[in-house]
């Protein structure tokens, strides 16, 4: 017989305590599961557990999750987010450069049922994304960081993409999914002598 691993809520969850000076033997007052005071409270009737947390995070009126997610995907496609400080959406982070666009994309993302492919499709089919990345010296001087989104995204490729491109150009890229790993440098052509050193 096979066992299926599942999680189940306990009848009496363990209490958590404020620990005085961080020492586990010096318990302070008991604390219950709740959201931070600066954020909206759990929905009425939501359980105070992981399910309640998930429902709270994905509620359509939650101010952060959809915006942070959209900003991260925008950053991956454009090289920088609509909010430049993507790791800090709080009061110490920067304000969005296009708040209406961020709100609209976040709303569309929630309305699509949190469909990441639909979000990507919306962004990459936009006129902003499909612009040429070339610009004149004058445009570069006026807007070096492309804050105005007047040209297409241009950012560095990650190492994996560079490797795949090098393998594709050399004819060594295997497009089949799965299988044994391929070391592109083991090909016999890789070891041809291309010059002779004078000793």
Question: What residues fall within each predicted segment?
Answer:
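Primarily short, surface-exposed interaction patches in extracytoplasmic proteins
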Residues: 1-198
């Amino acid at each position: 017989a096979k066992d299926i691993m599942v999680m189940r809520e306990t009848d009496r969850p363990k209490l958590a305590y404020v620990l005085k000076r961080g020492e586990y033997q010096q318990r302070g007052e008991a604390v219950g599961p709740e959201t931070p005071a600066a954020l909206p409270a759990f929905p009425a009737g939501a359980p105070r557990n992981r399910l309640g947390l998930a429902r709270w995070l994905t509620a359509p009126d939650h101010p952060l999750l959809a915006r942070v997610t959209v900003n991260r995907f925008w950053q991956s496609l454009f090289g920088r987010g609509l909010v430049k400080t993507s790791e800090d959406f709080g009061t110490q982070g920067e304000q969005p450069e296009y708040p209406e666009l961020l709100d609209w994309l976040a709303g569309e993302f929630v309305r699509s049922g949190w469909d990441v492919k639909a979000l990507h499709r919306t962004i990459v089919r936009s006129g902003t994304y499909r612009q040429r990345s070339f610009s004149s010296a004058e445009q570069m001087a006026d807007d070096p960081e492309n804050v105005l989104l007047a040209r297409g995204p241009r950012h560095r490729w990650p190492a994996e993409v560079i490797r795949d491109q090098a393998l594709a150009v050399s004819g060594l890229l295997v497009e089949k999914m799965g299988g044994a790993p391929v070391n592109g440098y083991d090909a016999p052509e890789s070891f041809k002598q291309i010059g002779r050193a004078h000793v």
